[in-house]
A protein has these predicted regions:
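Single conserved hydrophobic/aromatic residue that forms the stacking wall/gate
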Residues: 190-200
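Active-site entrance/lid segments in N-terminal catalytic domains of soluble metabolic enzymes
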Residues: 1-161, 165
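Active-site-proximal beta-strands of protease catalytic cores
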Residues: 133, 185-189
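Catalytic cores of alpha/beta
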Residues: 120-128, 173-185
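A generic structured-segment signal
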Residues: 163-167, 177, 193
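Surface cap/lid and interfacial helix-loop subdomains adjacent to catalytic sites
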Residues: 157, 184, 198-200
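Glycine-rich adenosine-cofactor-binding loop
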Residues: 168-172
Length: 200
């Protein structure tokens, strides 16, 4: 167990990326049941569907899971309250200022990690009181810094400034990438791989 798995409760230090329209209950529960940490997306903006997917998780797994809240694209703020009311224990925020909902989430006992593409963003997130960081290098999907800093360089730069647990996001696809991420200070790894039932 490391600092991030202590927060997620997952067996393995692997977290499934919250890909829009893809990271729904089928994928997230499969990851959870395999020992990783599944995350439900809300970036699609399909609020009712995403809420239904969160509710389905209790039927598909008895393992902990998370929800991603992309702040710039959160079309319905009721999603935040829904997470609180439905016992979600881990939230990743991204694409915006985490201070907007940090007090509500933390008051409810929810662990909050914020996705950052830069050292400056990491410092701001830490100052807001997040519990950890999703450090996203230029190799990853989603929103990245125009400075295009590689993941391993970015993790090391942030680690020198901030002592928060780090999830590494971007371009990690095999054991060598995992080992490298752990070596530079990551505690958990984002992966975006998806498989159908025949090869899950």
């Amino acid at each position: 167990m490391n600092r991030v798995t202590a927060h997620t409760g997952s067996k393995y230090p692997i977290i499934q990326a919250p890909m829009g329209w893809i990271a729904r209950s089928q994928l997230a529960s499969a990851v959870c049941n395999a020992g990783g940490f599944g995350v439900i997306e809300t970036s699609s903006g399909e609020v009712d569907n995403c809420k239904a997917e969160i509710e389905k998780m209790s039927e598909l797994t008895d393992q902990p899971f998370g929800v991603n809240l992309p702040l710039l694209f959160l079309r319905d703020e009721s999603m935040v309250e829904f997470c609180v009311q439905h016992g979600v224990k881990f939230v990743t925020t991204s694409a915006g200022d985490p201070s907007k909902y940090i007090d509500i989430l933390k008051y409810a006992g929810i662990t909050v990690y914020h996705a950052v593409p830069s050292v400056e963003g990491a410092i701001k997130a830490a100052d807001c009181g997040v519990d950890g960081l999703v450090v996203e290098g230029t190799e990853g999907g989603g929103f990245k810094s125009p400075e295009e800093v590689g993941l391993f360089v970015l993790i090391q730069a942030i680690r020198k400034q901030i002592d928060l647990p780090i999830i590494a996001a971007g371009g990690i696809a095999d054991g060598a990438g995992m080992a490298a991420a752990f070596a530079v200070g990551a505690c958990l790894l984002y992966t975006s791989d998806a498989a159908d039932d025949s090869i899950r």
